[in-house]
């Protein structure tokens, strides 16, 4: 269930926070206005057999509202689901800034850091 004390969460089914923290990689266009975030969730709880059919997108929820993407793809190993790969695309500097505000809140909630490669 959603945790009222969290300021940022990721959900694949509305109302159910995903506890598995993803690896996130960002890429931006040369002018910096557009780009994407690639999320990789290894063995997320949403892929359990009892919840598998409930994925409706990825919802990034924080105090400002929510960001949504429907680009959610499953990775299978030996016929069994092993990971989710999710792409979130932004198309303006304002969209990027909004995504980064969510990312900072999400990182703080999950004890994560940020590194630039």
Swiss-Prot record:
The organism's place on the tree of life at top rank = Bacteria
Q: Is this entry keyworded Membrane?
A: yes
Q: Keywords assigned by UniProt?
A: Membrane, Photosynthesis, Photosystem II, Thylakoid
Keyword Membrane listed: yes
Assign the protein's first listed, main location to one coarse class: membrane
One Pfam family this sequence matches: Psb28
Indicate how the chain sits in the lipid bilayer: Peripheral membrane protein
What does the record list as GO biological process? photosynthesis
Q: Record's Gene Ontology CC terms? A: photosystem II oxygen evolving complex; plasma membrane-derived thylakoid membrane
- Give the location in the cell: Cellular thylakoid membrane
Q: NCBIfam families from the entry?
A: PS_II_psb28
Family that this chain belongs to: Belongs to the Psb28 family.
UniProt xrefs under HAMAP family: PSII_Psb28
Give the record's subunit note.
Answer: Part of the photosystem II complex.
Name recorded for this polypeptide: Photosystem II reaction center Psb28 protein
- The organism encoding this protein is Prochlorococcus marinus (strain MIT 9313)
